[in-house]
């Protein structure tokens, strides 16, 4: 075993190792490795130095005092800019292979570069994102790696002295002939007169780092450790490339936490590189764009420690791979920088190439920096194009937080610049809400006020989606939820990842409303061939995997009853296959890998979750049992009055309330926010309850009305004095006698009245007779008149 120099007393070392071993037994990630890639180590306590004129709360350079081998060294550091985005995207996978995306919290301004005072050509790259100092630095020709000692309560750190490493020719697998062949397409485009313009403006490279499953296991499945390793690796590469005025920006990170996405068990790293560039182009580029991608592998190979292929800004196959074997960070970062140098046009150094007067440069066999030859190659390449390096990444760190249109820390809002804030009715330029305002942005914010409870802030997109509602107390809309995978939908389909998967619907979406799904004969005739029109997997530019007979129905979509050729995206090919025996015309589309970088979607591949038989679905181009969807929402769970969402909670129908749709309510789930009363849609349950309550209220009101009527009636009657019973009886008899007398009197009066009336009638009759007699007496007698004439 190699001897180790220890700069501690034996007692102190014993006290240091005991808690370290104890914590290790408890599962802590204690970084304490005296062997491996290090010559020696010692423990020190960095002392932060303060200077006059420092402004509290403003990011400024920092300095630490380190004592190594009995000598004091001052480490000056200043913050790195543009190293990370505001929200770093981290992709990982569940044990079932489902893709996850996270945006972990990373402290602001925790990455630094610097140098050691009074040390020749010293450089340092330090990260404080995990607490303590972690990184690399050199004092003269010696390189060190510093790590915080987690077992220490007094800010102790372990400083490792790295080996004097000469990588040799085994580092990079690229030969000079291969480099010349890869550079050939760019040579004729370069123009020497473009060098000054290219040098004047800095370049920016957006990088994606990937880590295989072995590396994830090496750090005890600690995803946070992998993230901070990636940040430090990128920081070291960025420090190297600042010499040529190019910045490295870590755009995203992918960790294969479940299994490796490509085969990595080849004896040579070059074969892994071939698989990786296919994965990058066919899978990674579809998820997010970048200028370059690099894969780290926890494995040794026979041919080299690192490989690369292609150039930045190329839509063709490009990428790099390297090994990451232990806790030594500087060596893998240097190998990555070497391969990234090839990606930006740098060749291997010749014997006459120098960096700071030395021969061990990055593009040779050392780690001092880039040589003068690398400078020339780099500027020659960027003069030939490489326009993607001109894009400035989004600023990840800004000193002035208020005004960047991002609500953060204690800000209530952020309307941007002063001019923009003058037009904002809700937010002030000091990132405070206007007086009387509740909010400024959000799906549940309108005219500076919260939307009322029950307002639909996100409509359902289809029958497999679910709506979300404002709660009246926040400007944010609840997270998007949808029906659980496996929920039945129309045309005998199933919901899967927020969409109804059905061959019938997929045929109509491509070939029009008259199209129908084809029978199994079409799938067998096409998908068992294994070309761009019929396959179960695209494995390369011109390589296709034919389907097995049992899985042919999960390959490329086949339709019938196609009347017209549809208008599809450019470069999409339609193919028809005639089956003479069945007299069928089968229709489908073709697809190949070169269409992926152009952003052309593959419309003709059967969607995962599509039914392929009774109790079976297509999943990853195989016809498998539908249990893979993990659908476990029985109707009884929601009392047959709702469905389960993707969080396995009941989303109730209108008229019933969550969580289990047992009580009367307005529907929704505990995840959707509270729905409101629908206009013109009152469910029967509410009608029944309303009628019962109305009748009950009427009954109560009737009883109350009768009661008060009787009370009021009794109250309005005149009061009567009480008297003795005998007196009351006498008065009652007198009253009775009086009543009889009155009745007799009344009867007598009636008889008198009748007699009087009779007399009057008799008198009137006599008068009429007398009047008649008088009239008759006055008439002349005719007989006497006749006698006088004679």
From Swiss-Prot:
The chain crosses the membrane at residues 688-708. Residues 780-790 have a biased composition (Basic residues). Changing residue 342 to L: Loss of enzymatic activity. Plays a role in lysosomal amyloid precursor protein (APP) processing by cleaving and activating CTSD/cathepsin D which leads to APP degradation. Residues 720-790 are annotated as: Disordered. It is found in: Late endosome membrane. Zn(2+) binds at residues 172, 338, 342, 348. The active site is at 339. It comes from Homo sapiens. Coiled coil: none annotated. It is a single-pass type I membrane protein. The keyword Transcription does not apply. The conserved cysteine present in the cysteine-switch motif binds the catalytic zinc ion, thus inhibiting the enzyme. The dissociation of the cysteine from the zinc ion upon the activation-peptide release activates the enzyme. One of its GO terms (molecular function) is metallopeptidase activity. This is Disintegrin and metalloproteinase domain-containing protein 30. Interacts with CTSD; this leads to activation of CTSD. Residues 629-663 form the EGF-like domain.
